[in-house]
Design a protein with these regions (language model features):
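CN hydrolase (nitrilase-like) catalytic-core segments centered on the catalytic cysteine
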Residues: 45
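Alpha/beta catalytic barrel-like cores
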Residues: 24-27, 49-83
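Active-site loop segments of alpha/beta catalytic cores
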Residues: 1-35, 40, 51, 55, ...
Length: 320
């Protein structure tokens, strides 16, 4: 099967001839913006035979709304207005994706772009400490700000698919750590903006991936995101202690992506070729279905990983 046919069939629980594979990582300083960033993506995806491309939003983590830089008390958030579709923050990300898409040797390679949920955008644009303090001071004010940011993140998703040729977004939700807030608080104040963006993205593509991020190493309340309307779910299996089969059941039988520890202590980064391939064969053998499973990592791989290691995974998958 061609890569596009393979990935889309797997997402739709249709028969496939092998398990799809996708890995990605952040790029170093000097390759986070502009043409160097585009070229870094092309150097990877045109030379490593993975089945899908996830384009990074490196350089665009911070939400550059002027008001966000001057907020002092929680009630200040009520004055927040969207950046709008013509703001460079949005326009430049769309242009990045189009440039990568146009430069791929395989024009059929499925392409996804990393979009953060509003609760991540607001914290990157200010600080985690400030937002959490304001959430305690006036949670409705923060929820209002998240709704405004959701307008920008939603139009970004729309333009990525209508103008840049994205097949879907890789939608990253964060902030659900068990030690941060309760499920009830998250669902009341954070979930509405999370879902607003994802639901808008779903209007333009049915192939959106939900990434339940565990980058900090702290377990999340996965219940926060259990009912989110995404086609594919990815979570930090090694942080959450929830393997692929259990996770697929937890998320209602949706297609799942992952299975590999992204950390430097994991076998993918530190194991021998024999160890890596043994792990991958065991992972595939553990799946309880011939479709609906995609091999990837808990999160981004370390930027200094030897790309030959991804080739080892691909070799094991193709020979399985």
């Amino acid at each position: 099967m061609e890569k596009r046919e393979l990935v889309m069939a797997c997402m739709n629980h249709l028969p496939i001839d092998r398990v799809p594979v996708g890995f990605w990582f952040h790029f170093p300083e000097g390759k986070k913006l502009g043409q160097p960033c585009v070229q870094a993506h092309l150097d990877y995806y045109n030379n490593v035979d993975v089945d899908m491309a996830k384009i990074m939003c490196d350089g665009y983590f911070d939400y550059p709304n002027p008001l966000a830089q001057s907020v002092q008390k929680a009630s200040d958030w009520y004055a927040l207005k969207p950046l709008g579709k013509d703001h460079p923050f949005i326009r430049e990300q769309v242009d990045r994706v189009k440039a990568v898409r146009d430069g791929l040797r395989d024009p059929g390679l499925p392409v996804f772009y990393n979009v953060f949920a509003p609760f991540s955008s607001i914290r990157y644009g200010t600080s985690d400490e400030l937002v959490m303090a304001h959430l305690k001071e006036d949670p409705k004010a923060v929820a209002h700000a998240l709704d405004v940011i959701a307008e920008d993140n939603s139009i970004l998703c729309e333009m990525l698919m209508t103008e840049a040729g994205c097949d879907g977004v890789y939608y990253c939700v964060q902030g659900g750590e068990k030690n941060r807030m309760s499920v009830e608080m998250y669902r009341k104040y954070i979930t509405p903006s999370d879902k607003a963006v994802l639901s808008h993205a779903n209007k333009f593509s049915p192939y959106n991936i939900l990434h339940c991020c565990g980058w900090a190493g702290d377990p999340n309340n996965l219940e926060d995101w259990q009912d989110y309307p995404a086609k594919v779910i990815n979570w930090a299996a090694f942080i959450e202690k929830m393997d692929m089969v259990k996770g697929r059941a937890f998320f209602g039988g949706k297609t799942v992506l992952g299975g590999c520890d992204n950390r430097k202590t994991g076998v993918l980064y530190s194991g021998t070729k024999a160890e890596v391939q043994k792990f991958i064969r065991g992972l595939i053998a553990s799946f309880d279905s011939d479709t609906g499973y995609m091999i990837g990592a808990d999160c981004t791989l370390p930027g200094d990983i030897d790309l030959q290691r991804i080739d080892w995974v691909l070799e094991a998958v193709h020979n399985a």
